[in-house]
Amino acid sequence: FRSVDPTRLVHYEGVTRIPNHQYDFITDMESRMYAKPQEVEEYLKQNSGRPYISCEYMHAMGNSLGGLSLYTDLEDKYEAYQGGFIWDYIDQAIETKNDDGKTVLAYGGDFEDRPSDYGFCTNGVVYADRTYSPKVQEMKALYSNIRMSIQNGMLTVENRNLFADTNNLSFVVRLEKNGVVLKSDTFSLNVPAGESKTMKLTLHKIDSAG
């Protein structure tokens, strides 16, 4: 690979499974599939000088991705941690009609096919019809470069972008009780890249339970 284009990084996950790391020189990064967060951190603590990428992680099948924050938290602690690639992006299913004539998304086993991998083609964070699964909410929040936190009536906006400020964004803060919006504020706040700003919230307190 390097002889064809020496400017590009080489990724080869297979060498990480060879004992004694004797072929580590082949790849420019450490890369593993489905390593536990503590295993990833163990490598990062060694500070070998090579970045770490999870080339496949967080098998997004069914009600999953609950532990994603254990990985994204490492981004704040270790510069060498470069994230990973969720398996996978979208479900593989076929739109068809069931016996009642209703349109459904069918997959392994729905066509009396044997052998079959059954639901193992439905591992996506997006459904086959391109609608978002609930897992997208978790992923979007943790992957966001803009973080907001509230403490003692003060709102802190952190901009983790490398270059872009927040000048083109609108921020919305809502006060809800039992799902009912009591008050909502929309405001602008220009936070330069890599910086944070804190402002006082104008939302009133709720004295009753709920």
Residue ranges and their predicted role:
Residues 169-209:
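Intrinsically disordered, low-complexity Pro/Gly/Ser/Thr-rich segments with frequent PxxP/GP/PP motifs
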